[in-house]
Amino acid sequence: MDFLHSAAPEPHRGRTKQILSLHPEVRTLIGPSPTTFWYIAGLVGLQFAVARFVADRPVWLIVALAYTVGAFVSHGLFVMIHECAHRLVFRRRLPNILTGLVANLPLFVPGSFSFQKYHLKHHAHQGVYDLDADIPSLWEARLIGHSALGKALWLLLYPIFQGVRSFRVKAVPPLDTWTLTNVAIQIGVNVAVYMLWGPRSFAYLALALFFSIGLHPLGARWIQRHYLVGEGDQETFSYYGKLNLLTFNVGYHNEHHDFPSIAWNRLPRIRAVAPEFYEDLAAHMSWTRLLFKFLFDPKLSLYSRMTRTSAAGDGPEPWGSDAAVATEGATAV
């Protein structure tokens, strides 16, 4: 078994050029959204408040709250870290790095700065095995196989697989000052939660993290983005269901890849301005339905990804210098 292969360039640069040619007003949407910082502050405060609340609550309530509340908060914070990676909270690099570290505080596992480094490579080299850490490793795909149990375990342990996978990308140094700072802060926060509030609060934060990207409707978001679940060779998919209201429009993934320097609260306007470019693309309407399809359809596996041998089409980005951080110009981050 192997991934699917394409000799064509990744699909987004070409579409971006076409959209800007026909709809130059899209450029007015480019730029950060500083009000995002207050959403981050609210989510961080809420997650720690719930963690404190469950300190002396029964285990069943802790699990229930982690699944129904904590998972959405943790997922929202992941989306906010993603915004920081693209410098979409503030314009300058340092405030976005620091804001990403704040968003990481309740997330149990340090990953804010590492995500920024590897995610920008994903945009610049979509589908290139040695540069795109979003592509599962071959050993990972072989280990998980096609069984529902294997795929369920993979989703449940996704943070671990993602962390190990990143070492495959030799172009990105795994350790640096900011990454180590992120690790040190997170260890300190986790120890403080355990010492001050006890093991149940600690467990709540851990469960919220794993539910947010695992066996939960939100976990299907990791499948929705680039897994080939339909006919044809479309390799990026958007989600237009109602949960976008609770997940900061993260489902608008084609739109995001076409314009990675447009903030989350303006992504729906891309499709509204240029509907002819998106109406014919396959899209998902239900993360829950997608989750079950991925788990129980034996034709779907970690091999259901499109790869390419070179980052065809690399070069200056068509949407202009304001978006440079989302490209190979990401070396500035």
Regions found by a protein language model. Name each.
Residues 83-99, 131, 136:
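Aspartate-rich (DDxxD/NDxxD/DxxxD) Mg2+/diphosphate-binding motifs
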Residues 57-61, 84-92, 122, 168, ...:
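Membrane-interface elements of multi-pass transporters and channels
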Residues 52, 90-91, 131, 234, ...:
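Short, function-defining helix-loop hinge/capping sites that tune catalysis or transport
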Residues 71-81, 111-113, 159-163, 206-232, ...:
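Transmembrane alpha-helical segments that form the membrane-embedded catalytic/substrate-channel core
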Residues 77-86, 115-127, 221-230, 246-262, ...:
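Histidine-centered catalytic micro-motifs
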Residues 97, 101-105, 234-247:
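Membrane-cytosol interface motif
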Residues 1-71, 105-204, 265-266, 271-333:
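Non-catalytic, topology-defining segments of multipass membrane proteins
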